[in-house]
Amino acid sequence: MKVFIILGALNAMMAVGTGAFGAHGLEDKLSDKYMSIWEKATTYQMYHGLGLLVIGLISGTTSINVNWAGWLLFFGIVFFSGSLYFLALTQVRILGAITPIGGVLFIIGWLVLVIATLKFAG
């Protein structure tokens, strides 16, 4: 699906931008603890953005379950990386419970991708 190529490219682009912003704009403003959180958010956004690109490239050749995997990864980025960016910038922990939800969405998304691929290949 073209939407996952677009979402993947946008997330990869944003991960590069937020990584550069963190390295050059936030390094003197955030403690090491919160810089580490910021870096984790950018890293996971990049990995899963690349995953979205792959899903976009293969989605026309496999089952509809691949689309589910794409949406799970996308919302995983929103919840996981989004809550970590918020935490790093504000030090407000109120969204801390959302971060693991994003992680679970990542795990389920990758699992759905494996299952969809096995069904298609089988």
Curated annotation (Swiss-Prot):
GO terms for cellular component: plasma membrane. Its main location: membrane. The chain crosses the membrane at residues 3-23, 46-66, 69-89, 98-118. It is found in: Cell membrane. It is a multi-pass membrane protein. It comes from the Bacteria. InterPro entries: DUF423. Keywords: Cell membrane, Membrane, Transmembrane, Transmembrane helix. The keyword Flavoprotein does not apply. Belongs to the UPF0382 family. This is UPF0382 membrane protein SE_0353. It comes from Staphylococcus epidermidis (strain ATCC 12228 / FDA PCI 1200). The lineage of its organism: Bacteria, Bacillati, Bacillota, Bacilli, Bacillales.
